[in-house]
Structures are given as structure tokens and as C-alpha cells.
């Protein structure tokens, strides 16, 4: 939108100045005036006078004043006549800048208030001043007053009257036809500082906005106050600098100021002037010396509180929750910082672990002395026990081929150390038979003598010890004790049965009163410390992984139940082996624990022994979750020998009691309910039914005799134990064909093809990465 404003006549009141100058484009304009004239100040009230005839002449180089008017105080009045246009080439440069500011101001106001330029054009109808207006104004006799003050007062009175009497339609009709002789007056729309003749539409716009956004009474009061302040401003305005368009000099002052000084003084002037924060829009539209920033900051800024709800209170409201959120934010930041620090520490620790692993592997590979090799191997073993995550780095460093070559050296100590570290890394030798052979023993306390009878019969048929018959032995509670005695310590069955009976008599002998007190105190009827002492003496404090030093030792595991990880119990496996890097078992476990700790944790039956705390975990009897560990043993074997088929799995029970009595009661007691829950949790037949249906024929063998009496777990009387043995022998006699079939399977040797395949695999593992002929 382009607006052309043509100002025909400007009358300047100048005081005590000799000359002033300006610039029009590149040419300098000099205005020659009398010695006495009024000085221009944009703070004071400046009025616009219209005359009927032109009294000043304009040319490119000079402007000469041809008419002087003197007031009662004998001050000279210099009347300067300048025809200016925002698009005309003859306008002063500074005034043109101000006209462009007015234009940009109108654009901003139109966008902020009316919303479109079309509405702006329809509402703001501009009228170009003409000679008719000049004659109308001159007829009023505004310039006939004897002094300036009276002229200003008459201007105020006239403007107030014209604002009340005239309307937009009357003003429009007056400009349309002057010769009709109507008494309609032309609008003189004044502002408080500098007058700009934009017509009745601006007055209507200002009045409408002020009435909508402000209190009318408050605006009228502010208008009267400012009008009263205008009078002393005219009398006392002698030391204030002129407007940016005019430079003045006092008679007793120095040389005239140049244009640069004028600009610097004009820029410093607004800082010292008090400007109201809320002014009418007509004031901003009529002030060419103020820019768009003043409009937005002063007037539009005053409208924002009307459009929004108290913006000053919003920061306060935001600060209050922010203050309350400060502790939460600090806690979150502290937690985040701790998490980052822990993560960084883990990364640093992981890097240091990997570097340490590489250093140990490289040191071992550089060693040639067998004794020094043993030391290096043990150092690497201890390192991997403490940091199992380093096994992957060791495998990448080709530690397995080097260890397999070391195992060929005729040194028993070195071979034992190499077997231990190979088992820790997860490397395993081929199975003993044609496939994987698994032995799983249920829990049941002293009723484990029933399982001993089955094993005795199996040894008689195969003529081999148990640890040579099976590749993997797993047990729960009393089954873990049997697995350790048979698989790790290679005890004969007679010695094992004698030790088993002695353990029962030593542990399960307790006074009823003392046991009841202990039960209420530690939830354990028997003394757990006595049981731990017996285990340390009989089993020892060797680590589980150290049993892998024996070349005839099978893979052995004991199962316990962790009760403090989550809401549901979880099975935990104490192993004498490790899984190969990249192989993940579904069950928790480790091989860095002592053997007596494994048995203690696996046999911590609730009510009999106290739960066992190992590290951060709380262990109880494994029978609470998996009283039949056959499925767990099968899963572990698939992790150890993933490419080897299953030859057989033998599951040994400790006897089950089935009552034929049927109760006719319609309800059960709380004790009965709890007993049913425990029985269902420790049930072993469901796993048997599942495996029997899933596994191939002649692969799964379950031996669990039915006993005629419900014998408790802590039965230590010899007659009761003899009764259990007798019932077990009768059961084996009834299943003699089944036992013979199992013995035949366990007695089979590997085929020649399997032996060749195992030899090729061993050679390929020993010389991995080396030329083909070196493998032969």
C-alpha cells in the first residue's frame, strides 16, 4: 500500500537563530531568516497556520522568506513555505525519511487492527489539502491574534468544537462542493505534539480504538492534563534542541552546527524526554519524528494487556511451579549424572578388562617355559573368573588353539590347568558315547536312598562307575549331594550310602523343643550352622570350576531357587563349567562358587534349614521350583553340545506316595490348602509326563517307585531307611527289562566314523588359522 502525503505549507516559529540548513538529495538548502524568530522544538506544541497566499518562494538552492509577522513581544515570526511529498523529488531528505516512517506506521497499524489493506483503504480516506481549505482557515482569522498564546488557545477551541459538530459525511460533502455555501467546517485534527492532517477517518479510528481498548474518561483526563502542560512548555522551551529537520543557532552562540552535529543531537534527544507508555493512536500517527518502534512499544504495547490476561502475573505464576520443581529437577539431574558416571565407569572398566585380557593372552603366547606357562594360565583363569565378560576377547585373540596345543604337552599340572581354563571359556570335549547322556536326580531328603538303589543296579549291569556313564549330572537338594559325591568325588556307591546315612543322622537329629524355638526364630527347625560345618568338612572349599581339572569328571550342576529377584522365584544353576561366548542359557548361574556353598544353597528347604544368602541373592531349596531337574539338564546340555544328539536321559525320583483314601468333606482346612500348594510346586510327575511325550522312544527313562508310606524328608531312623531301600529294590525288579535296556544304551561305544569326526574336529581347533598340512 502506498500513501502520498502532500504538505503544502509548513509554518515554523524560530527564535534567535541566523540561519539553518538542510539537504535535498545531494544539494544543500539554506534558509535565510531574520535575527529574531521562534525556535522549533518537537516537545512543545507546534501549530499549523494556513494563509490565503503564498509568502515564501522555493527554488533548488535557497528558500527566502517574504513575509514576517511580529507578535506583541516583538518576536519575529518566520513563515516558511515548503511543498513536500513522500514521493516528490523536492522533499527534504530528513522529512522524506519521516514520511516513510509514517507510511510504515500506517502499514503496521493497518495489519494489527484492520487485518487487511483493503479495509484500511476503505476506512482511511485521505484528502489532499487545497486552496479552499487555506481560504477557509484564513477566513477564520487565526493569524489575526496579537500573540502566539491566543492563537494556540483559539486553535484548541476550534479543534474541540469541530470534533463535536462535524462528522465524516459533512467533511466529505464540504470537500465535494465548496460553492453551496454551507456552514460546514473543515476538520482540524490536532495532536499533542505535532499536527498531521490525515482527515476525519484518523480521528474516527483513534476514537474507536480508544473507546474499545481504553477507558474514555481516563483518556479525556489525560488529554486535559497534557493540554495544560502545553502552555508552560511554550514559555520555558529555550534550552531544548530542535527537531531533526531543523538546526537553530542562538545569537550569542558559536558557529552554526553542521549536519552531522544535528543528527547526533537529534538521536540523543529522545533519551531525555519523558514519554508516556499509553498514548492515543492519533498521537503516534501525527508525529513524524517517532518511528514504528515507538508505536509498537508505546501504544500497541498498551493494547496487549487488554488482549491477554495480565502478562506480568504469568512469569510469577510460572516461577512458583518452577520453584517447586527445582528439587525434582535437581534430583533428576543428580540421578542422570550418577547414571552417566556409572555408565562411564562401566565403559572404562570394560575397556580396561579387555586390555588386561589381551595382555594376559599375549603374555601366555610368548611363554615357552612349561612352568611359566602354568603360572600364565592360572593368572588368565583367575582374571576370567573375576571378569567373565573377558572370555569373548580371549577367544578373539585365538587363545583356544594355543591352549589345545599346550594340552598335548606331557605335563599333568599344565594339562589340568589348561582343562580348567578351557572349561571356563566354554570349550568342551566330545561326549563319551554316541550322544549326550544325562542323569537328573530329584530332591527328597533322606529318601535319596531310593535313588541310590537304582544307581547301584545300573552299575551292576554296566560294570562302570557313574561318572563314566554320564556326560552331565544334575541334582536338586539331596540329589545335588548325590551328584557331587558320584560325579565330582567319584565315590563308590557303598561309601556314598554310608556317608549319606551319617549325614542324615548328624543333621536331622534335633530336640523338638529346641527345634520349635528355632523354627519360630529363624524359620528353620534344624541348625543350619551345623549343616554348613559338615559340608565344609566333607565337601571342601574348592571352587566348582576346579573340578574340571579331572579329565574323567563330567559336567555337574546343582539347582537352587532365588527368591529375592522379582516377584517370582528363579532357578539358579551352580556349574562346574562355563558357556561359550555368545551362548546364553535361560537359567542364572555361575562356576565361581565353592562346592559346599552350592550344596548349602540347593538344600535350604523352607522349614528345615534357613535360607542362604550368597552375595546379593537369597537362595532356597531348588525343589521349590524344579524338583525334577530333567528339563533344565536337557536345556543346559543343548547349550554345551549344540550339535550333538541326545542319546538318553535318566531321571531318578526319591519315591512318591499315593493315598487311596477319599475324603467326603465339602471343604478343606487352611493346612490342607497349603499342603496342596506345596505338593503341586514340588510335583515331579508333570515334568515326567511332558518329557515322556516329547522325547523319542528309548531316550527318556524315569525311575520313581511308589512307596506305601508317606515318609518325611528328615527321616533319619535306620528302619525307615531300610524300608525305603526294600521298596526300591522291589520296584527295580518289576522294571528289570527297562533297566537292562538302559544299561545296554549306556554301554555302547562310539562308532569309528564318530571317532574320526572327533579327531578331525580336534585338529581343526588346535591349528585354527594355520596352513592345512600343519594340521596333519
UniProtKB/Swiss-Prot annotation:
It holds the Pfam family Patatin. Keywords: Endoplasmic reticulum, Hydrolase, Lipid degradation, Lipid metabolism, Membrane, Microsome, Mitochondrion, Peroxisome, Transmembrane, Transmembrane helix. A motif (GXGXXG) lies at residues 443-448. It is found in: Endoplasmic reticulum membrane; Microsome membrane; Mitochondrion membrane; Peroxisome membrane. It is a single-pass membrane protein. The chain crosses the membrane at residues 469-489. Residues 439-634 form the PNPLA domain. GO terms for cellular component: endoplasmic reticulum membrane; membrane; mitochondrial membrane; mitochondrion; peroxisomal membrane; peroxisome. A motif (DGA/G) lies at residues 621-623. The active site is at 477 (nucleophile), 621 (proton acceptor). InterPro entries: Acyl_Trfase/lysoPLipase, PNPLA8-like, PNPLA_dom. Disulfide bonds: none annotated. Its main location: endoplasmic reticulum. It catalyses: a 1,2-diacyl-sn-glycero-3-phosphocholine + H2O = a 1-acyl-sn-glycero-3-phosphocholine + a fatty acid + H(+); a 1,2-diacyl-sn-glycero-3-phosphocholine + H2O = a 2-acyl-sn-glycero-3-phosphocholine + a fatty acid + H(+); a 1,2-diacyl-sn-glycero-3-phosphoethanolamine + H2O = a 1-acyl-sn-glycero-3-phosphoethanolamine + a fatty acid + H(+); a 1-O-(1Z-alkenyl)-2-acyl-sn-glycero-3-phosphocholine + H2O = a 1-O-(1Z-alkenyl)-sn-glycero-3-phosphocholine + a fatty acid + H(+). A motif (GXSXG) lies at residues 475-479. GO terms for biological process: arachidonate metabolic process; arachidonate secretion; cardiolipin metabolic process; fatty acid metabolic process; intracellular signal transduction; linoleic acid metabolic process; lipid homeostasis; phosphatidylcholine catabolic process. Signal peptide: none annotated. Calcium-independent and membrane-bound phospholipase, that catalyzes the esterolytic cleavage of fatty acids from glycerophospholipids to yield free fatty acids and lysophospholipids, hence regulating membrane physical properties and the release of lipid second messengers and growth factors. Hydrolyzes phosphatidylethanolamine, phosphatidylcholine and probably phosphatidylinositol with a possible preference for the former. This is Calcium-independent phospholipase A2-gamma. The gene is Pnpla8.
Amino acid at each position: 500500500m502506498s500513501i502520498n502525503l502532500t504538505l503544502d505549507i509548513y509554518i515554523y516559529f524560530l527564535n534567535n537563530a541566523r540561519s539553518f540548513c538542510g539537504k535535498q538529495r545531494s544539494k544543500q538548502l539554506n534558509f535565510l531568516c531574520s535575527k529574531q524568530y521562534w525556535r522549533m522544538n518537537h516537545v512543545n506544541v507546534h501549530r499549523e497556520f494556513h494563509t490565503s497566499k503564498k509568502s515564501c518562494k522555493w527554488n533548488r538552492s535557497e528558500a527566502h522568506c517574504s513575509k514576517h509577522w511580529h507578535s506583541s513581544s516583538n518576536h519575529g515570526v518566520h513563515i516558511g513555505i515548503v511543498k513536500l511529498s513522500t514521493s516528490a523529488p523536492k522533499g527534504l531528505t530528513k522529512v522524506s525519511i519521516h514520511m516513510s516512517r509514517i507510511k510504515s506506521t500506517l502499514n503496521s497499524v493497518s495489519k494489527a487492527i484492520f487485518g487487511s489493506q483493503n479495509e484500511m483503504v476503505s476506512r482511511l480516506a485521505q484528502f489532499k489539502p487545497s486552496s479552499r481549505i487555506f481560504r477557509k482557515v484564513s477566513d477564520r482569522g487565526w493569524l489575526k491574534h496579537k500573540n502566539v498564546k491566543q492563537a494556540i488557545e483559539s486553535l484548541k477551541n476550534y479543534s474541540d468544537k469541530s470534533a463535536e459538530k462535524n462528522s465524516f459525511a459533512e467533511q466529505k460533502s464540504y470537500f465535494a462542493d465548496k460553492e453551496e455555501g454551507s456552514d460546514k467546517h473543515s476538520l482540524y485534527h490536532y495532536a499533542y505534539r505535532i499536527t498531521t492532517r490525515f482527515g476525519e477517518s484518523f480521528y474516527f479510528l483513534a476514537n474507536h480504538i480508544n473507546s474499545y481498548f481504553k477507558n474514555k474518561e481516563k483518556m479525556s483526563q489525560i488529554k486535559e492534563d497534557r493540554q495544560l502542560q502545553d502552555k508552560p512548555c511554550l514559555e520555558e522551551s529555550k534550552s531544548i534542541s530542535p527537531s531533526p529537520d531543523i538546526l537553530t543557532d542562538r545569537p550569542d552562540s558559536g558557529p552554526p552546527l553542521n549536519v552531522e552535529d544535528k543528527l547526533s543531537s537529534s538521536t540523543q534527544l529522545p533519551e531525555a524526554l519523558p514519554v508516556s507508555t499509553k498514548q492515543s493512536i492519533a498521537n503516534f500517527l501525527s508525529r513524524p519524528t517517532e518511528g514504528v518502534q515507538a508505536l509498537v512499544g508505546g501504544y500497541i504495547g498498551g493494547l496487549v494487556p487488554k488482549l491477554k490476561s495480565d502478562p506480568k502475573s504469568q512469569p510469577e505464576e510460572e516461577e512458583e511451579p518452577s520453584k517447586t520443581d527445582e528439587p525434582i529437577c535437581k534430583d533428576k539431574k543428580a540421578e542422570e549424572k550418577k547414571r552417566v558416571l556409572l555408565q562411564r565407569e562401566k565403559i572404562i572398566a570394560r575397556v580396561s578388562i579387555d586390555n588386561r585380557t589381551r595382555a594376559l593372552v599375549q603374555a601366555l603366547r610368548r611363554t615357552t617355559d612349561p612352568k611359566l606357562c602354568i603360572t600364565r594360565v592360572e593368572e588368565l583363569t583367575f582374571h576370567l573368573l573375576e571378569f567373565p565378560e573377558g572370555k569373548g576377547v580371549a577367544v578373539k585373540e585365538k587363545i583356544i588353539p594355543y591352549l589345545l596345543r599346550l594340552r598335548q604337552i606331557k605335563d599333568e599340572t599344565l594339562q589340568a590347568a589348561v582343562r580348567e581354563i578351557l572349561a571356563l571359556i566354554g570349550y568342551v570335549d566330545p561326549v563319551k558315547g554316541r550322544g549326550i547322556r544325562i542323569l537328573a536326580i530329584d530332591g527328597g531328603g533322606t529318601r535319596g536312598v531310593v535313588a541310590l538303589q537304582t544307581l547301584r543296579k545300573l552299575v551292576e549291569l554296566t560294570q562302570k562307575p557313574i561318572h563314566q556313564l554320564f556326560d552331565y549330572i544334575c541334582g536338586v537338594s539331596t540329589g545335588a549331594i548325590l551328584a557331587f559325591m558320584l560325579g565330582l568325588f567319584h565315590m563308590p556307591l557303598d561309601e556314598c550310602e554310608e556317608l549319606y546315612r551319617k549325614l542324615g543322622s548328624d543333621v536331622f537329629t534335633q530336640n523338638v523343643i529346641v527345634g520349635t524355638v528355632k523354627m519360630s526364630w529363624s524359620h528353620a527347625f534344624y541348625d543350619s550352622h551345623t549343616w554348613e560345618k559338615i559340608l565344609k568338612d566333607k565337601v571342601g572349599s574348592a571352587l566348582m570350576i576346579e573340578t574340571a581339572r579331572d579329565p574323567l569328571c563330567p559336567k555337574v550342576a546343582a539347582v537352587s531357587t532365588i527368591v529375592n529377584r522379582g516377584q517370582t522365584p528363579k532357578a539358579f544353576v551352580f556349574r562346574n563349567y562355563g558357556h561359550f561366548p555368545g551362548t546364553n542359557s535361560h537359567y542364572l548361574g555361575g562356576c565361581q562358587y565353592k562346592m559346599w556353598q552350592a550344596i548349602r544353597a540347593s538344600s535350604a528347604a523352607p522349614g528345615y534349614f534357613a535360607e542362604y544368602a550368597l552375595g546379593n541373592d537369597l537362595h532356597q531349596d531348588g525343589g521349590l521350583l524344579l524338583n525334577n531337574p530333567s528339563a533344565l539338564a536337557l536345556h543346559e546340555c543343548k547349550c554345551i553340545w549344540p550339535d550333538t544328539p541326545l542319546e538318553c536321559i535318566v531321571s531318578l525320583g526319591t519315591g512318591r506316595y499315593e493315598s487311596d483314601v477319599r475324603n467326603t468333606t465339602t471343604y478343606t482346612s487352611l493346612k490342607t490348602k497349603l499342603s496342596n500348594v506345596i505338593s503341586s510346586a514340588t510335583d515331579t510327575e508333570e515334568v515326567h509326563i511332558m518329557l515322556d511325550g516329547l522325547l523319542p522312544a528309548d531316550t527318556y527313562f524315569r525311575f520313581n517307585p511308589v512307596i506305601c508310606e508317606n515318609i518325611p524328608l528328615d527321616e533319619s531312623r535306620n528302619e525307615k531307611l531300610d524300608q525305603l531301600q526294600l521298596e526300591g529294590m522291589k520296584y527295580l525288579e518289576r522294571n528289570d527289562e527297562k533297566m537292562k535296556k538302559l544299561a545296554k544304551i549306556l554301554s555302547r561305544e562310539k562308532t569309528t566314523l564318530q571317532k574320526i569326526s572327533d579327531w578331525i574336529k580336534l585338529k581343526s581347533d588346535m591349528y585354527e588359522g594355520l596352513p592345512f598340512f600343519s594340521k596333519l
